[in-house]
């Protein structure tokens, strides 16, 4: 898939913008604080209805307006789709082909994106919540049912934690009802995650071995707070551990086990990647991003859109070449932001260049 056209009204420093793109490489050049990242963020937001930079929708609204509108024309294998998001103080409205979408899971996945931003380099050593978010964003685009089950899980988890905080003593019968619901949704969330990580590991290892010239292997491990012996037993063992932890959870006023506490670990040649070099971290993250692209194509039949936000300068020529070879070979529409073309020595022909200045975007040329 690829985005043919994007229109922004009152988005951050863009008062009004209408732009059309190449189905291949699109490069946005400009000084810092001109709007390059805002532009990629808008594409990301149109896809996922959320920003990767802020949780506050009001920060997305142009300073002298009260509403935001984003519309995009997406070319999928199945045909052209129009997406629209409108934000105001009354909330947000999402539309597909002018039809309002009641559920988030009905909207997300229509336009898939993979973002590679400087903060992704913290994925290995950062908090476990970053790695859970990484899994949730990818899985939510690939499997809409996952988003629905995760939403149900979080709703029951909130109920359970609220009860634990407010109860003077445990009502075992009431807690048992919540436990059954939580274990049911949670087991399905974990099953989806485990399948995803297993598939992602195969793709990521292939890319990592190519980047390292066969010197390194990459493996991933889903680390669950729920102890289980096999995937088919997750529900029963999760439920058992919830019941076993009633007193501990009551004392701590929160739920101690479940997918909300799970983690993801990375290993290079069998060693924890927390102890890897900075160069190995860059190769690992690059391998993951290329694996995301490959896996989305394999599981959905359509390519995602790749957003590279100021990361090419973080990669040496070898890693740049591997990345661009992949997106060109797989025919992936790619958006690159940069302050200069000087370090992009490996750019191929047939790219479209845009200049970004103070919230305006001008097409330079198509290079053939």
Swiss-Prot record:
Binding site for ATP: 30-37
Localization annotation: Cytoplasm
GO CC annotations, alphabetized: cytoplasm
Database matches in Pfam families: SMC_N
Keyword match Translocase: no
One BP term from GO: SOS response
GO function terms (MF aspect): ATP binding; single-stranded DNA binding
Key words of the record: ATP-binding, Cytoplasm, DNA damage, DNA repair, DNA replication, DNA-binding, Nucleotide-binding, SOS response
Family: Belongs to the RecF family.
PANTHER family xref list: DNA REPLICATION AND REPAIR PROTEIN RECF (PTHR32182:SF0)
Family matches, as HAMAP family: RecF
Record's function text: The RecF protein is involved in DNA metabolism; it is required for DNA replication and normal SOS inducibility. RecF binds preferentially to single-stranded, linear DNA. It also seems to bind ATP.
Annotated protein name in UniProt: DNA replication and repair protein RecF
Protein species of origin: Streptococcus pyogenes serotype M12 (strain MGAS2096)
């Amino acid at each position: 898939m690829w985005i043919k056209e994007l229109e922004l009204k009152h988005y951050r420093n863009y008062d009004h913008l209408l732009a059309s793109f190449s189905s291949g490489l699109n490069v946005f050049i400009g000084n810092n604080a001109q709007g390059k990242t805002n532009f990629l963020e808008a594409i990301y937001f149109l896809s996922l209805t959320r920003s990767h930079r802020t949780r506050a929708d009001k920060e997305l609204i142009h300073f002298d307006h009260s509403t935001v509108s984003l519309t995009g024309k997406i070319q999928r294998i199945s045909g052209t789709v129009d997406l629209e998001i409108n934000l105001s103080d009354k909330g947000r409205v999402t539309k597909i082909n002018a039809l309002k979408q009641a559920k988030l899971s009905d909207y997300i996945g229509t336009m898939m994106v993979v973002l590679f931003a400087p903060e992704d380099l913290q994925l290995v050593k950062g908090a476990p919540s970053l790695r859970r978010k990484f899994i949730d964003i990818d899985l939510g685009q690939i499997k809409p049912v996952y988003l629905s089950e995760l939403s149900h899980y979080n709703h029951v988890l909130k109920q359970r934690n609220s009860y634990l905080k407010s109860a003077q003593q445990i009502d075992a019968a009431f807690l048992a009802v919540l436990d059954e619901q939580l274990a049911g949704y949670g087991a399905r969330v974990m099953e989806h995650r485990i399948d995803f990580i297993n598939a992602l590991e195969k793709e990521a290892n292939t890319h990592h071995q190519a980047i390292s010239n066969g010197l390194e292997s990459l493996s991933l491990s889903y680390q669950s707070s729920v102890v289980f012996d096999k995937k088919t037993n997750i529900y029963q063992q999760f439920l058992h551990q919830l019941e076993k932890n009633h007193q501990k959870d009551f004392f701590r006023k929160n739920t101690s086990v479940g997918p909300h506490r799970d983690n993801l670990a990375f290993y290079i040649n069998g060693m924890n990647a927390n102890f890897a070099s900075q160069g190995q971290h860059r190769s690992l993250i690059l391998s993951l991003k290329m694996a995301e692209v490959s896996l989305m194509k394999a599981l959905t039949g359509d390519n995602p859109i790749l957003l590279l936000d100021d990361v090419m300068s973080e990669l040496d020529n070898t890693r740049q070449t591997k990345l661009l070879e992949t997106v060109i070979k797989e025919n992936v529409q790619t958006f690159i932001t940069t302050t200069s073309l000087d370090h992009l020595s490996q750019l191929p022909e047939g790219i479209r260049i845009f200049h970004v200045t103070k919230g305006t975007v001008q097409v330079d040329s198509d290079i053939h």
